[in-house]
Amino acid sequence: MLVHYHLATTQDLPPITAPLYEYVFAGNGVFKRACRDVMSATIPVCNVRISGLTPVKTEFSTDFGRVPETVVARILEVATEAARQELEALFYLSLRSGEWRLEIPRQIQTYDSVEPCEKGAGSPYERAVIEIHSHHRMPALFSSDDDRDETGFRIYGVIGSLNPARDYWPVINLRIGVYGDWWPLQADRIFEMPPVLRDHNSE
């Protein structure tokens, strides 16, 4: 089975063994958890009291350092240039020998969408640990289209409030995605933040 199911009868959950993800039924609700080589997550998907089971905590752990500020600044630079044309932009961040690598894939850009030209094996999409797209002048909020598209196990981000025509303070919004469910993340946990960039989840 690709998905496993557990009852939380003690505070110590067994190691994650499901090929995709696991549901945990706990005293404080239903949780979804998954792991990959560089991170693991346990996030709530339903808040409900279940008598006789042990409560479970939301957890997110990583085995990598923060994305350097120089890389974040480059993302802002490209996103700002796209915003001048009122286009969205797409970025992937992957790890190579423990170092972050920014990949800007060939992409189809419009005013309200952006898509990579390829998603197959060996593509930047397939390698990505972090996936970010920009919303130019629009707010840094995940849309229903984002929810439909962002169904893998990775960190997702959206950058908004990019207005190159005047002084601006762009905003980033991050979340960990666990196969169609999400939990917000503070950006400074993942990125070295440039002074100009604000965090939606810290406001």
Where are these regions (language model features)?
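Conserved beta-strand-loop surface patch within small alpha/beta domains used
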Residues: 1-130, 137-203
